[in-house]
Amino acid sequence: MIPKKIHYCWFGGNPLPPLAVKCIESWKKYCPDYEIKEWNESNFDLNCNEYVREAYEAKKWAFITDVVRLYAMVTEGGIYMDTDVEVLRPLDDLLVYEAVSGFETKTRIPTGLMACREGQPLFEELLHEYDGLHFKRPDGSLDVTTNVTRITNACLKYGFVPNNTKQTVNGFTLLPQDYLCPKSYEDGKIYLTENSMTIHHFAGSWVSDVDRYAQELGKKLTFLPESIRGYVAMFCSNVHCNGFAAACKAVSYTHLRAHETLMN
């Protein structure tokens, strides 16, 4: 069983915004017997590896959180939630899994809500991937590869099919989008069903300029098939923000492999 523990991260020392306070209250309402643990500068080793140290020096809190959420789940087990995730009903049904999350779109694995048992092998693998990484590249630029990309890449290696259907990959169960993420990242609408347990509100404090531009552009590309709309928006956003050469470098194995799977 996954333990009744909710983890969240808050680095930088600023007060929690109103939405975060509201969401945490919803956790307490529907999960009253769960321990809630905040991870911050006081209880996490910011020198645990070069990636975390460099991300903290750059004040890129979201990328520190990418590591901390994995560390919390691997070492203690439980449910990790971003502070903009609202709980709609009890989460006990998630506790029976070895590890669980759900689709953020029809093709993307979200990281705003993830859960696993202590020591889950895939999550350990994902955590240790950061041990050999640097957040600051030799040329001074920052590696802003999201954990969505890293986790999706790892799952593709184990047979993940990006098609918004329930599946289990190396012990990691993925639920359809309506369970944990019924709010569309692209159009902002909420599509609740009887399955919906949480809403990720995408507050965007962590969102890069590239992601934010891609999100807005995606809303205008409705003439494109949904299966490729996000990829086109992300590529065009990279061109807009970073130039064509950088955009070409940013075309990830994740996007190519996912599109290939959808087309087959």
Language-model features: locations:
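A structural signal for well-ordered alpha-helical segments within the folded catalytic domains
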Residues: 4, 18-21, 25, 67-74, ...
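Conserved catalytic core of nucleotide-sugar-dependent glycosyltransferases
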Residues: 97-148
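GT-A fold catalytic core of metal-dependent nucleotide-sugar glycosyltransferases
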Residues: 61-109, 113-118
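C-terminal catalytic/acceptor-binding lobe
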Residues: 190-243
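Catalytic core and acceptor-binding pocket of nucleotide-sugar-dependent glycosyltransferases
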Residues: 131-199
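N-terminal anchoring/stem segment of glycosyltransferases
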Residues: 1-49, 157
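Active-site-proximal specificity loops/subdomain of glycosyltransferases
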Residues: 39-65
